[in-house]
């Protein structure tokens, strides 16, 4: 599962150095971390929903998720401060590359009517956000283990200064962007 990291070091980094004219290898953008987040609004009624979602996310990312809690009480949402509202995992290093490779090669092609990911989902600082509607696209999750389909947000944090640099990095890493 070192293919993506090897590809970055051998092909992507030299190509980006030439394309953007970096003087140092350390100036070339790289992927810093990947944050996978699941918001669980239904956890207020069903206390086991967080446990089930955490188990599924741990299978997908190979890392135990942390439970995120509400910062403020909001009476309209029947939400109290400190109530669990979601789960998240921050992937770095080896696990990050394993997850990204799994997402590119297995997960994204299994999405129904997939024509590529949105090329405009950059935040202006070189980070990319991707929303996935169901967790069934990952091979670790079978249809039998799922009680409810849950979506997730995937944020790819890069060291790129601009969106153009980040897009070039992610495109050369193999992320299939939609043609505009």
From Swiss-Prot:
Superkingdom of origin: Bacteria
Pfam families, per database record: Ribosomal_L5, Ribosomal_L5_C
Gene3D superfamilies: 3.30.1440.10
SUPFAM superfamilies: RL5-like
HAMAP family: Ribosomal_uL5_B
Function recorded in the entry: This is one of the proteins that bind and probably mediate the attachment of the 5S RNA into the large ribosomal subunit, where it forms part of the central protuberance. In the 70S ribosome it contacts protein S13 of the 30S subunit (bridge B1b), connecting the 2 subunits; this bridge is implicated in subunit movement. Contacts the P site tRNA; the 5S rRNA and some of its associated proteins might help stabilize positioning of ribosome-bound tRNAs.
NCBIfam families (UniProt xref): PRK00010.1
Protein's name according to its UniProt entry: Large ribosomal subunit protein uL5
């Amino acid at each position: 599962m070192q293919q993506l990291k090897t590809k970055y070091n051998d092909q992507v980094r030299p190509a980006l150095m030439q394309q953007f004219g970096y003087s140092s290898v350390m100036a070339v953008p790289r992927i810093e971390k990947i944050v996978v987040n699941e918001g669980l609004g239904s956890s207020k009624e069903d206390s086991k929903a967080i446990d089930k979602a955490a188990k599924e996310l741990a299978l997908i990312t190979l890392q135990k998720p942390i439970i995120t809690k509400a910062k403020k009480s909001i009476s309209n949402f029947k939400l109290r401060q400190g109530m669990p509202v979601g789960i998240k995992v921050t992937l770095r290093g080896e696990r990050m590359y394993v997850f990204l490779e799994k997402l590119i090669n297995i997960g994204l092609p299994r999405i129904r009517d997939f024509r590529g990911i949105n090329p405009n989902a950059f935040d202006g600082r070189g980070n990319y956000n991707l929303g996935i509607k169901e967790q069934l696209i990952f091979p670790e999750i079978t249809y039998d283990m799922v009680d409810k389909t849950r979506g997730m947000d995937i944020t790819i944090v890069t060291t790129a200064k601009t969106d153009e640099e980040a897009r070039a990095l992610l495109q050369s890493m193999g992320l299939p962007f939609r043609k505009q």
